[in-house]
């Protein structure tokens, strides 16, 4: 799809707030069981190896999974189930750079969560040092939460129903049948 076709999409072809919320709920349901298995595996591995590396890899895995799904398939599992696609200005799946920009708030939030999560373990100097940063990461998470809320609320009030992260990345969430 070229940029000209993007201009001809109707307002109803762009996915609104509540349908995106439903996609997020589906994501949680679809990913929950595998996520719990990965969590249990990586955390038990961390304890048995006396290393935080498996826990850090767990956080990295979920970031990479999100980015991969957007670049390769044009959406998260929930979006794909609901026949939505994430596209860029050229009407194609987002590039790696666009997917990274699109997920910047989630990546930052995950880093803060990782710092707090790893600091709960007392395995090596890594967790001891991260424990020093945990209060700051926790406070920054509290600041990031309302920013992420505003980010998602943009969908309800912007032309083409774009979240702040969509605007930053140059992406759109559209009905699959429209492209």
Where are these regions (language model features)?
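Membrane-interfacial and juxtamembrane segments of integral membrane proteins
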Residues: 1-179
């Amino acid at each position: 799809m070229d940029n000209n076709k993007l201009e001809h999409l109707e307002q109803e072809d762009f996915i609104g707030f509540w349908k995106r919320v439903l996609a997020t709920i589906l994501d949680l349901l679809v990913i929950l069981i595998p996520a719990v298995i990965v969590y249990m595996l990586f955390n038990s591995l961390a304890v048995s190896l006396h290393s935080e590396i498996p826990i850090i890899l767990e956080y990295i895995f979920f970031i990479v999974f999100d980015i991969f799904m957007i670049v390769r398939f044009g959406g998260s599992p929930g979006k794909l189930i609901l026949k939505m696609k994430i596209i860029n200005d050229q009407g194609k799946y987002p590039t790696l750079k666009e997917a990274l920009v699109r997920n910047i708030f989630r990546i930052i939030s995950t880093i803060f969560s990782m710092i707090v999560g790893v600091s709960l373990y007392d395995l090596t100097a890594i967790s001891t040092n991260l424990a020093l940063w945990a209060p700051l990461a926790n406070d920054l998470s509290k600041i990031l939460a309302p920013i992420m809320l505003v980010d998602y609320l943009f969908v309800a009030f912007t032309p083409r129903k774009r979240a702040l992260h969509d605007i930053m990345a140059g992406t759109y969430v559209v009905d699959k049948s429209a492209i």
